[in-house]
Amino acid sequence: MITLRKLTDGDKGQFNKLIVSEAFDYEAFLNMGWCVNQIINQLNKNTNFSYGVFDNRSLVSFILGDLLNIEKISEYEILLIYVVKKYRNKGIARKLINKIEEKNSCLKKIYLEVAKNNHQAMLFYKKINFKKINIRKNYFCINGKKIDALQMAKTY
């Protein structure tokens, strides 16, 4: 049974399972500058607003981000979004972003950074109305190679 719910510190075991599973591209995860401890720290932040998708209690997808509220206006920064390969192209990432949108009636903008060579992700974001707003030169280091990041945003 597929369920979507807010992530908590209690889900750290699920992240450990996901990272050691064959479905998770651990090298890409590390190249993005993330580790399990950073995820746990994110889940404990006051600004954390993150969701996970579970299949029979196993984490198969997640969105990590910060919700920033400034005078009744909200902005959300997607820090990391991931879907296990076997669950891709099933609308799960879109459902996660929709959940962020529906839970925040004052939301004015969602923004993120994506590696310029991650064409699949860029197509996905464009399809759901994200627009390129900037380029950050040499932002990511993937397999020892510097990659530009596209900053993208969706405004409401």
Residue ranges and their predicted role:
Residues A115-H119, N138-Y156:
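C-terminal "cap" of GNAT-fold acetyltransferases
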Residues V84-N98, A115-L123, K127-I128:
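Conserved glycine-rich acetyl-CoA-binding loop
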Residues I97, N104-V114:
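Conserved GNAT acetyl-CoA-binding A-motif
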Residues I2-T3:
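Extreme N-terminal starter segment of soluble prokaryotic enzymes
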Residues K6-R88, R94-K99, K103, T155:
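Acetyl-CoA-dependent GNAT
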Residues K126-R136:
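Conserved acetyl-CoA-binding loop of GNAT-fold acetyltransferases
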